[in-house]
Each structure stands twice: as C-alpha cells, then as structure tokens.
Amino acid sequence: MLADMRWWLRHGRDNGYAVPHFNVWNAEMLMGIMDAAEEARSPVIISFGTSFVSNVVYEEFAHLMRTMAEHSAVPAVVLWDHGRSFEIVHNAYRHGANAVMRDASRLPFEDNVSETRRVTDYFHPRGIPVEA
C-alpha cells in the first residue's frame, strides 16, 4: 500500500521504531527489499535518485516502484532522493514518487533556504512531503 511518509515517520518516532529507507538501483534490489519488508511486516521507504539515473531510465523504473508500493502488503513510500533541481524532483513526482528530496546543499546557504522554500511551497499543498 502506498504510504504517507510523514505519517509513518511520526508514528515510528512516537512508538519507538525506525522506518527503514533503502536506495534501490534495480528491479532485483526492489523485489528483495519489498519481500523483506513484507516478511518483517515493516513499513519501508524505497528511493531512487539522481546518482542512479545513468543505470536506469527513471520514468520506467518509477512505474515499477510505484506499482510494487501500491500492491505491497506493508506501507511503502516511493521517494526521489537527492534531486539536484526543482525540475528533477517535479519530474519524479509526475512519474510516481510520493515523497521528494531536493538536495540544494551545493548552493550558498541563503539560496539553499530559498530553494527549499520554493520546493516545499509547491509540494506541500499537493500532500507530498519534502526532505531537504
């Protein structure tokens, strides 16, 4: 089942457990992680990011991640990790991510804060959590 990352992170904090987060590079990793999460009956965050784009076309892989999350017996979040631009995280959202991470750490501090505000102003009203 596709899950809201904010809800599960709060629930974990309030109940003394962590929600595991795995960067996924290919279908075999994705299936192994989802099988393990279901066996453990644990919510899970599966992510894909800019570092992995050369390995797989995101639009195609995002569909597989989203489909597996939606059909999972446990809560699963699809997170785009370390997006280097607004356009990258927006594209990930359009193709199935239900959480995004905008990495503006290479910008000067004030620009980083401004960019983070721009991203959160766009995504939060759409119910999409932002890690920054």
Name the predicted role of every residue range.
Residues 1-20:
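N-terminal amphipathic alpha-helix/helix-capping segment at the start of soluble metabolic enzymes
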Residues 5-6, 27-72:
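Glycine-rich, positively charged N-terminal anion/phosphate-binding segment
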Residues 18-23, 44-48, 76-82, 100-102, ...:
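Hydrophobic faces of well-ordered beta-strands that scaffold small-molecule active sites
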Residues 28-31, 54-62, 84-91, 104-131:
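Active-site-adjacent beta->alpha loops and helix N-cap segments on the catalytic face
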Residues 40-42, 94-100:
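Glycine-enriched alpha-helix->loop->beta-strand junction motifs that scaffold or abut catalytic
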Residues 72-75, 95-97:
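Structural recognition of alpha->loop->beta junctions
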Residues 80-85, 95:
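Long, hydrophobic/aromatic-enriched structural stretches that serve as scaffold segments
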